[in-house]
């Protein structure tokens, strides 16, 4: 048994399999950051912080001594509780293939959004500087006319190249922007196809972000450091329900300020 306490949950092996499957595919469907940043191997439940390799000057304890603290980024634990019906759980053992796992999917979606918001927008309470605030490139404004968006993306890629940032490059679009470029056409083709021809990388639907980002995916510029990857744990149960949660521990580091260009709506 580990500190997820799953062995104590009144959930059959078959039901656990379905719960994990729904959580995994919903999380992967909505998360975007992991597709464009480096993701570390999980450090394990005992991991509490990640070294930045830097030193912080502190007051010396006595004359003739120089003191420094090793700078580090603490890992934040993100937990999303959800409740499942025991009736729905037991239906799996009775052969049902349509148990209601909506609470699992809602929790997975919420966790994916929180992770992406931390990566791109930052999370000050957890000492995370997001890509937007860490970028040294001037943000570019997204035009109201979707037909002009490819020109702005081309400008962003040019800025990356002028800053000495090699490709490949990827473009992340918020849900609203992605819809606009998918539904608007020019010369008979969706704007999304025009963008695809411009970008030597992926065009990614990123529903958690605001606006858009153009960034390099060459590696070594952005680092999602995990303590424990997304896991499902058990809290309690009663005669009718089981209380579970999705959880991960992480921090995020930006190593290269010029490696991304934010696009603002």
UniProtKB/Swiss-Prot annotation:
InterPro entries in the cross-refs: ENCAP (IPR007544), Encapsulin_nc (IPR051429)
Subcellular location field: Encapsulin nanocompartment; Cell membrane
Keywords: Cell membrane, Encapsulin nanocompartment, Membrane
Keyword flag Cell membrane: yes
Cystine connections: none
Chief location of this protein within or outside the cell: other
Domain of life: Bacteria
GO cellular component, one term: plasma membrane
NCBIfam families, per the entry: encap_f1
Record note on quaternary structure: Found in a complex with DyP, suggesting it is the native cargo protein. Monomers form pentamers, which assemble to form hollow shells composed of 60 subunits with several openings.
Function: Shell component of a type 1 encapsulin nanocompartment. Assembles into proteinaceous shells 23-24 nm in diameter with 2-2.5 nm thick walls. Cargo protein DyP is targeted to the interior via its C-terminal extension; probably only 1 DyP hexamer is incorporated into each shell. Probably involved in protection against oxidative damage.
Similarity comment: Belongs to the encapsulin family. Family 1 subfamily.
Protein name: Type 1 encapsulin shell protein
Protein's organism: Mycolicibacterium paratuberculosis (strain ATCC BAA-968 / K-10) (Mycobacterium paratuberculosis)
Gene responsible for this protein: enc1
